[in-house]
Amino acid sequence: MTFELVTESLLNANKINDQDVFIALEELCTRQLDYGDLYFQSHIHESWILENSIIKEGNYHSDAGIGVRAIRGESTGFAYSDQISLDSLRRSTKKAHSIILTKGSGKTKTLSKKTIEPIYKNVNPLEGFSSKEKTDLLYRANYIARSLDHRVIEVNASLTGSYEQILVASTDGNLVSDIRPSIQFSISVLVEDHGKRERGRSGGGSRTDYNFFLNQDDSSKEIRIDHWSKEAVRIALLNLSSKEALSGTFPVVLGSGWPGVLLHEAIGHGLEGDFNRKGTSIFTNMIGKKVASELCTIIDDGTIKNQRGSLSIDDEGTPGQKNILIENGILKKYMQDKLNARLMGVKSTGNGRRESYSCLPMPRMTNTYMLSGKSKLDDIIKSVDYGIYAVNFSGGQVDITSGKFVFSTSEAYLIKNGKIVTPIKNTTLIGSGLEVMQKISMVGDDLKMDEGMGICGKDGQNIPVGIGQPSMKLENLTIGGTV
């Protein structure tokens, strides 16, 4: 059903048929290619923004186009058009294949339509709710946040939804499609008390429609949008009473869920195939070697139902996969797209991703997480005489080559004598991804995925991702504070 809908929308409606697609691939093969593909995409997106208790913006954007790629060795010919038509397909094909100078007489394989089992429903979130119902979600969040505490002086909230259709045709005979819904809600709250101000943020998203926000969250047992609104206020008020963080080297307990962003940034990017093929990753040539504590098994899984980073197929037409990257501390594989996989003598892992038809695909993460261990969070906390409990992060930076990182917490606590004693702020975690992985001494049994807010940037391309981990203990991590 998905394939027929996408074919009708992207091809037939633009007076392109299967034979036209095959002829374009044949044209690519008049040069000596290792691989070539056509990428058709349509994308519609809306956003609603609330500030100062009023709707400040309502935006709608639509885009569609074709990307054509021809690959020989490490050379790539690429052209794209922001129109889907037979003429633009032909012109883009000629431009892409002209960059490959060596003539050839190769043949594309007969196109075979592959049915891929979708891991999210074919729903268009932009159509399910009226404009009033969408803005009412923002007004609801604003009301809840402001009614919780008189110290709330500012509430900013946003709602976004998108609906994407893609079709990939390649010289190896694949003809596959996908429909990708996506939604996200975010809220930021500013509180003030006696001239002192602090901010709290929360939100979430999924690959479904806006009803998701009005459904009950499994863990909090509250309506999701209500829960996130309360969370933003809670974090802001918590930071009002937080003490300045100490500097030094201490044990650190990481919370479950979003703190997995540290793994994503400090470890995940270093396991992407392009960095390792070029020798610029700290993990280059380390397949089969111990790179982490034996307690660590890290997975990238594009097949988790409705998760933000999930993909029925990647942007090269490879089905989404569950890849074990590190198993019991041993590096097992890198994440690969087709180009880097071929050059490294392995298969694509379903991680070829691109922001749009105007961008080249590259190895990217989907949903990256660490498996649960056997420890209870309470026992992990009790094992720390003096240290930090980092529940959530606000942001960070990492150097792929060295693996060094700096991350800032948005919610953290001081641990003394095995007990959480006081909230702290302005806390930064400083270290190296490779070193941190070796310092993991306890792993909790409470694996949790993030709420659906992940956006990953690489080489100017932003894509949705999922992040997760159980709670864990790191021995002797450098903490940057103000005291």
UniProtKB/Swiss-Prot annotation:
UniProt cross-references to InterPro entries, sorted A to Z: Metalloprtase-TldD/E_C (IPR045569), Metalloprtase-TldD/E_cen_dom (IPR045570), Metalloprtase-TldD/E_N (IPR002510), Peptidase_U62_metallo (IPR051463), TldD (IPR025502), TldD/PmbA_N (IPR035068), TldD/PmbA_sf (IPR036059)
Keyword flag Protein biosynthesis: no
Disulfide bonds: none
GO biological process: proteolysis
Keyword Hydrolase carried by entry: yes
A single cellular component GO annotation: cytosol
Pfam families listed in its UniProt record: PmbA_TldD_1st (PF01523), PmbA_TldD_2nd (PF19290), PmbA_TldD_3rd (PF19289)
GO molecular function (one): metallopeptidase activity
Domain of life of the source: Bacteria
Keywords in alphabetical order: Hydrolase, Metalloprotease, Protease
E.C. numbers: 3.4.-.-
Function according to Swiss-Prot or TrEMBL: Probable metalloprotease.
Entry similarity comment: Belongs to the peptidase U62 family.
Protein name per the record: Metalloprotease TldD homolog
Organism: Buchnera aphidicola subsp. Acyrthosiphon pisum (strain APS) (Acyrthosiphon pisum symbiotic bacterium)
Gene name tied to this protein: tldD
